[in-house]
Amino acid sequence: METSGRRLSGKVCVITGTGGSMGGATALRFAREGASVVGCDVSVEAAAATVEMVRAAGGEMVSKQPCRLDDPADCEALIELALHTYGRVDVLFNLAGMQWFNWLEDITDEEWDRARRNEVDLVFYLTRAAWPHLKASRGVVVNMASLNASLSFKTLPSLAHTTNKAGIIGMTRQLAMEGREHGIRVNSISPGLIESNATRHQLEDPEWASAMLGKTLLGRLGRAEEVANVALFLASDDSSYVTGTDIVVDGGMKVW
């Protein structure tokens, strides 16, 4: 396998949503840095394809699929897979999530509850399951937030998504406080407009794409690999004095 600085050598990293663009890119990036990766996804085929990609590149990875992270039992089973296979958990990257978009007057009670379960509850359940083992390893948690937690866009009916991701940033700050005595660092990442499976259909609308790119200083979409690079920084000792914060990866959208 082509390696970089081996910044995660000997580390066991649990990454959720490895069937997606960012999850797959992160699994490969972490493996190239020496990590043993434990992935999961609701999509059996996509998750299996990522395992095959990582192993073909010479990396070490196992995966649980399908895995419903809104089910506490599945979260416990995922952590047990990591412990059974590699004996420890050093890094938890809560990347997975499903978004539902609708305006206030159109969103249903069921959609609101479903959005919360698939953006907030799953982070709580899995972090709770991993916490005793992260205490033992003085580990790291990285949570996936969103630029929507701090910005609103007139073209995007993101009430539930905005609310949930703001909650993730708050949860991150609280977890960092609770983890401080155990050497656990907790941070989050807020991506802007990243080309991924989740955004590709939105980008097919020229008006929407033009409006969003027009608010980006760098004038282009972000790449999944660019988010993975930030996740690597937060997961590694390179960020040993960083905790309780949110890092924005948005090409300058927030400041313009």
Model feature map: region roles:
Residues 12, 19-21:
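Conserved glycine-rich cofactor-binding loop
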Residues 2-5, 232, 243-256:
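Short C-terminal tail/terminal secondary-structure segment
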Residues 90, 98, 105-125, 142, ...:
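Catalytic Tyr-X3-Lys loop
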Residues 142-167, 172-173, 177-181:
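Catalytic loop of short-chain dehydrogenase/reductase
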Residues 180-185, 242-244:
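Short, small/polar-rich loop/turn modules that mediate ligand/substrate recognition or access, typified
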Residues 33-49:
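Conserved glycine-rich Rossmann-like NAD(P)H-binding loop of the short-chain dehydrogenase/reductase
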Residues 76, 98-113, 154-160, 200-204:
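Conserved mid-core segment of classical short-chain dehydrogenase/reductases
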Residues 102, 118-138, 176-177, 181, ...:
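Amphipathic alpha-helical dimer-interface segment in Rossmann-like NAD(P)H-dependent oxidoreductases
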